[in-house]
Amino acid sequence: MIDNITGEKERINPFFLPYDTPHYTVPFNRITLADYEEAMMEGIRREDEQIEKIINNPDEPTFENTIIPEDEVKGRKHYYDLLSRVESVFFNMLSAETNDEMDALAQKMSPILTKHGNDVSLNPKIFERVKYVYEHHGELTPEENCLLEKSYEGFVRSGALLDEAGKDRLRKLTEEASMLSLQFSQNVLKENKAYTLHITDEQQLDGLPNTAREAAHEAAKEHGLKGWVFTLDAPSYGPFMMYSTQRELRKELYMARNTLCIKDNDTNNLELCKRLINLRREMAQLLGYDTFADYVMKHRMATKVENVYKLLNDLIEAYKPKAIEEREEVETLAKEEEGAAFKMEPWDLAYYSQLLKKKKYDLDPEMLRPYLELGNVIKGVFGLATRLYGITFKENKEIPVYHPDVKPYEVYDKDGSYLAVLYVDFHPRKGKRDGAWMTEFQGQWIERDGTNVRPHASLVMNFSKPTEDKPALLRLGEVETFLHEFGHSLHGIFANTRFESLSGTNVWWDFVELPSQFMENFAVENEFLRTFAFHYQTGEPMPDELIEKVIASRNYGAATACLRQVSFGLLDMAYYTHKEEFTEDIISFEKKAWAPAIIDEQRMDTCMTVQFSHIMAGGYAAGYYSYKWAEVLDADAFSVFKKEGIFNQATAQRFRDNILSRGGTEHPMTLYKRFRGQEPTIDALKERDGLTKGQ
């Protein structure tokens, strides 16, 4: 369009136009802050129009004229589905590339978007049509049945059967919970990014490997400082806690990390957590459930709270004796080093655990870094997918990205056909939250004309950064994280379902971690390491002796690590099995809730809950146990590959066909048994963790 006064071409919001980028990828380079609000408001208006069309259809409600259109309104991220498309970009940027203006816009738009979602899910006229189809439908395919069930249950679980007073109350609860979840995340991010440990005396770097020193020197320059800067981001925090000989500095860093959001300031999350727990409890009880956990279990493989506790208690029984042995061994070494009177504190654990590992296996994780250069690791991980599934990856610099660090790849199937776009974003920066995750800018679905719309997946991580004279050299744990998130992306890349809301990672939460945790198993497999672990300077392969040490030490600390995850699961369930109003002190409650899985003396001046985004602001409320549930599945599944060959393409094809490509189109156990031939047992997990010997 041409402006009549200036004669200049009028700018059009890029969200309003069909993307003219490769594969209809997001034109990040054209999007401004103002575009988001305008597009979201227009998207709401358009969705309202679509809902009215469904409601006012004079024909008898059917699967074709009600369920499919209703699913399309709520789910698609393609160029004609404006609201879902702009939301997927905005909220992904809120985690990966945010700023104060983005945060403020999120605070403004969150209640508006929540209200719109409630307007749809609590609309009695559209529910009436969905309910009619649910009660009168004819023969449907299994996938259609799944969508119908999901649609009907979605309305019911959103309050469609409540009276008007109940609906109004539910609206208020969900709107407040949405705002508080956002505030929780923003508080954690602000406090995390605000802290730095600035060192100017080089003697205080004693014990730290060169990679940590160089990264800290780069961080200091980024902050406009001389010397070295350490932060609470994992690539900085982890090595400092493992290697620094400066006990007081370890304590300072530990306390900074573990006292986030409990100080007397405007980012304190203590009362906010109580309110979120109570909001979710009240929502669940309004919908007829005793607790929020009962509400969640309706759509979980676990099915009942009792089954979750059985898993967690079985793991405590199996792993706690070994974890106590592991801790006693670390404490014995610490006393040998420091004297019999030495009392080990939490900020000592990583340091002495690392010393013990080095003593037992003659292995220091820093010995591995030169062989784990990021470029080689990328080739190794992508090459693993090529070897298993025949797919290939091609970087396409014509695809726009949201930050120069991000690399976009096209993914092609073994027959050469286009499969997906995959973005990878590896390093920490200001405005990017801590941790690692997989997300999507576009899902997968099949159009009515048969067109298979392919996904745009993104892997976001916080790995060790390159320095002035070294490329990014990773820890083995970072390689495992890469494999984990890559496993999630394969769940999306291989998706091949008719409906987007059943596609890829749109599965029950205690099944969604199977593909990701399954991939982690390859990290310590000799055959896999030999494909990419080459010295970044000499090109020499990782020595056999070093690989043997990695494999020999694979179970080091496994019981302690298991109990840590179980403790988080216990904490999560304790909050969300609460039947009465939660009024207890968060810190005291936390220590009591996870006590059965704790083997150390507890501190009352630290708190996990206030920064536990998974269960307070993420999708894992009453669901953190899912990691251990899926670990049982992944160990059982990988045992098949160990038996048939870890690169066995026939086994991999069976995994792809029955699990990775099917999304949520059938019950997860049905899909798993079709791949495995039987239900999983805990035996493979215990064997993998060294608690039992293989048969």
Give residue ranges: language-model regions.
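Short pre-active-site segment immediately N-terminal to the catalytic Zn-binding motif
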Residues: 464-483
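C-terminal, non-catalytic "cap/extension" segments appended to globular domains
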Residues: 3-38, 42, 229, 376, ...
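Short, hydrophobic/amphipathic alpha-helical patches that form generic packing surfaces
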Residues: 78-92, 149, 153, 255, ...
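Short His/Asp/Glu-rich catalytic/ion-coordination signatures at enzyme active sites or charged loops
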Residues: 20-35, 88-109, 130-172, 229-271, ...
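Active-site-proximal, well-structured secondary-structure segments within enzyme catalytic domains
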Residues: 143, 147-149, 186, 190-231, ...
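N-terminal helix-rich structural modules
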Residues: 2-208, 641
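Short, glycine-/Ser/Thr-/acidic-enriched flexible segments
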Residues: 235-237, 283, 414-416, 426-430, ...
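Intrinsically disordered or highly flexible coil/loop and linker segments, enriched in small
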Residues: 45, 49, 53-60, 82-96, ...
